[in-house]
C-alpha cells in the first residue's frame, strides 16, 4: 500500500525506534497517524494498543542483540511500563512525603542542574563525590538519558524520566560498573525494587555473558540484587539533590542497601590469574 505525500510526511516525523520496532504492525494495518490524538506533553507520542505491543516486542528483541542501543532500551521500558507498573511506581511516590515533594518539584538531573566541579570538590565518601567519581571512572555523563515519549499520563511520564535519570546514582552507591555484567546485576536490583518489566527483561542478557560471568551473577550478584532490592526502601523516593553532602555509607544504611563485592576488583583479579596461568 503506497502512502500519500501528506501521510508519508507525518510518518517520517515519528521516532526512528518506533518505526523500526513496529514495522510488522505498519505492514499489516493502516497507520493511524492522521487520526492520532493530540500529545499530552511536549515530545509525547500517543500509541494504540497494537502499536505499543509492537514497540515492546520489537525494541526488546533488538535491544537483546544490541544492548548498547539506549534508545531501544528506553522505548522498551516505556512500552512495557503501562498500564500497571508505572502507576504502581507513581503511587509509591505519592505514599511517601519525599516522593510527593519530588512529584511537586519535578527536579531534573543533568550537568546543567548539578555542578560537577562542586561535586568533585566535596569530601571523600559523600554521595555527591561518589557520584562524580563514578561518572568520571566510567566515562559517562548525566546528559545521556532519552526523554520519555510513549507514556500517556504526564505525571507518570515524569516518574519514568526520574527513574531513568537516577539510574547512575544507583550505580554510584552500589559501585557496579557499566560493563554488561554490572548492568545486569543492577537491573536485577532495580527489578526487585521497582517491578518495572524492562528491568526484569534486561536480565535475559545474562545469557550473553561469558560462563565465568554467568556463574558470578548467579552465585554472587543475583542473590545480592534480589535480597537488597526487596528489603530496601523504594529508591525512586530518594531526593538525590538533597543527599549530595551526606555520607554514602549512612545513606546506604538508611535505605537498607548493602554494597556488593567490587566487580571491577573481581574482574581484575580474574584477568591477572589467567595471565599468570598463561605465563606458567
Curated annotation (Swiss-Prot):
EC number assigned by the record: 4.1.1.130
Entry annotated with the keyword Iron: no
Any GO BP: ubiquinone biosynthetic process
Entry's localization field: Mitochondrion inner membrane
InterPro entries cross-referenced by the UniProt entry: Coq4, Coq4_euk
Membrane topology field: Peripheral membrane protein
Pathway(s) annotated for this protein in UniProt: Cofactor biosynthesis; ubiquinone biosynthesis
Catalysed conversion reaction: a 4-hydroxy-3-methoxy-5-(all-trans-polyprenyl)benzoate + H(+) = a 2-methoxy-6-(all-trans-polyprenyl)phenol + CO2
Cofactor(s) it depends on: Zn(2+)
Gene Ontology annotations for the cellular component aspect, listed alphabetically: extrinsic component of mitochondrial inner membrane
Transit peptide location on this chain: 1-31
Residues that, per the record, bind Zn(2+): 167-168, 171, 183
Keywords, in A-Z order: Lyase, Membrane, Metal-binding, Mitochondrion, Mitochondrion inner membrane, Transit peptide, Ubiquinone biosynthesis, Zinc
Family membership: Belongs to the COQ4 family.
HAMAP family, per database record: Coq4
Subunit-structure text: Component of a multi-subunit COQ enzyme complex, composed of at least coq3, coq4, coq5, coq6, coq7 and coq9.
Main function: Lyase that catalyzes the C1-decarboxylation of 4-hydroxy-3-methoxy-5-(all-trans-polyprenyl)benzoic acid into 2-methoxy-6-(all-trans-polyprenyl)phenol during ubiquinone biosynthesis.
Protein name (database record): Ubiquinone biosynthesis protein coq4, mitochondrial
Organism of provenance: Botryotinia fuckeliana (strain B05.10)
